[in-house]
């Protein structure tokens, strides 16, 4: 059985994952508005991944005999000055998610809830990948700078991204 404190934190994180999906869709909308369909696709796929994470937490809460609670999702940032800004904001968002999963893991450890610790390890591994991915994209975009040909090619590459739940 999940402790009240752990259940509250899991519900908070589940809702935060759905907020992250909204934030990535807002970034996709910005990219579409600026005619960057490849970058828009990248963020749409990222939003799908965040919804998958939310669903994974939802399933876990219910599998543990508790109740997943959905809350209002606040409006995400919608104005960006550049593609680079969307990726920098994404990295900040992922760093916040990592911090939140560390906090969840600490609560589970204090509760000696080893099943939840095991469950959360998947997310911690995922966060290492997410942060590294966004750091790489930021490095590439910074290196590209104002080179429109390089940006075009990079956008086309990211436009091929898909999300597979496997």
Curated annotation (Swiss-Prot):
Alphabetical UniProt keywords: Cytoplasm, Iron, Iron storage, Metal-binding, Oxidoreductase
GO CC annotation terms, alphabetical: cytosol
Residues bound to Fe cation 1: 17, 50, 53
Pfam families per record: Ferritin (PF00210)
Gene Ontology biological process: intracellular iron ion homeostasis; iron ion transport
Reactions catalysed, as given in the entry: 4 Fe(2+) + O2 + 6 H2O = 4 iron(III) oxide-hydroxide + 12 H(+)
InterPro entries: Ferritin, Ferritin-like, Ferritin-like_diiron, Ferritin-like_SF, Ferritin_DPS_dom, Ferritin_prok
Ranges of residues in domain Ferritin-like diiron: 2-145
List of residues binding Fe cation 2: 50, 94, 127
Function (record text): Iron-storage protein.
Similarity comment: Belongs to the ferritin family. Prokaryotic subfamily.
Protein name: Bacterial non-heme ferritin
Taxonomic path: Bacteria, Bacillati, Bacillota, Bacilli, Bacillales
């Amino acid at each position: 059985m999940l402790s009240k404190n752990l259940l509250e934190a899991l519900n908070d994180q589940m809702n935060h994952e759905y907020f992250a999906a909204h934030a990535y869709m807002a970034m996709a909308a910005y990219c579409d508005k600026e005619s960057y369909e490849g970058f828009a696709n990248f963020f749409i796929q990222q939003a799908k991944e965040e919804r998958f994470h939310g669903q994974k937490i939802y399933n876990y809460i219910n599998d543990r005999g508790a109740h997943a609670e959905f809350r209002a999702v606040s409006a995400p940032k919608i104005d960006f000055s550049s593609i680079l800004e969307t990726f920098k904001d994404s990295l900040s968002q992922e760093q916040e998610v990592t911090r939140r999963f560390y906090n969840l893991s600490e609560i589970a450890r204090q509760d000696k809830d080893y099943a939840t610790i095991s469950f959360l390890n998947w997310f911690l591994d995922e966060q290492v990948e997410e942060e590294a991915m966004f750091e790489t994209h930021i490095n590439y975009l910074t290196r590209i700078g104002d080179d429109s040909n390089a940006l075009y090619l990079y956008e086309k590459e990211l436009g091929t991204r898909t999300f597979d739940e496997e």
